[in-house]
């Protein structure tokens, strides 16, 4: 039996891409779509409620005992960083690989977003990974 990777998404948009790009990976992939966090952000619920919700959802996912949790929602990723979550199960955050590759770029970078609600969290995390000298349009 192959180990299981849970992919946590805010929408179904990434499922097909993940399945296609990770078909050779040695994992069985289980997708979990959670739209509620985006609803909480849209309705401007207090940050502490959002953090508590993320912890609750993370605990539910960990009960499934995956080998790996892959988080594709940058809002989830940003909140995970704010709550300093620790778990025995590795959590892979979708943006970290990209940010590592962008560290050495000296030309302006153009970032395009398909979801305006992910801009704040994505840019905060981006600035943590790269130097302030990187110009973003």
Question: What does each model-identified segment do?
Answer:
Residues 1-137:
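Non-catalytic structural scaffold of enzyme domains
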């Amino acid at each position: 039996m192959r180990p299981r990777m849970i992919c946590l998404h805010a929408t179904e948009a990434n499922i097909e891409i993940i399945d296609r790009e990770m078909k050779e990976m040695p994992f069985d992939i289980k997708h979990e779509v959670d739209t509620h966090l985006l609803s909480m952000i849209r309705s401007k619920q207090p940050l502490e409620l959002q953090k508590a919700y993320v912890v609750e959802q993370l605990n539910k996912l960990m009960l499934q005992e995956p080998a790996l949790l892959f988080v594709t929602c940058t809002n989830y990723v940003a909140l995970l960083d704010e709550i300093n979550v620790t778990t025995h199960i590795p959590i892979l955050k979708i943006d970290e690989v990209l940010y590592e590759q962008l560290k050495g770029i000296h030309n302006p970078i153009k970032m395009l977003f398909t979801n305006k609600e992910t801009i704040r969290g994505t840019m905060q995390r981006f600035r943590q990974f790269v130097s302030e000298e990187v110009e973003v349009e």
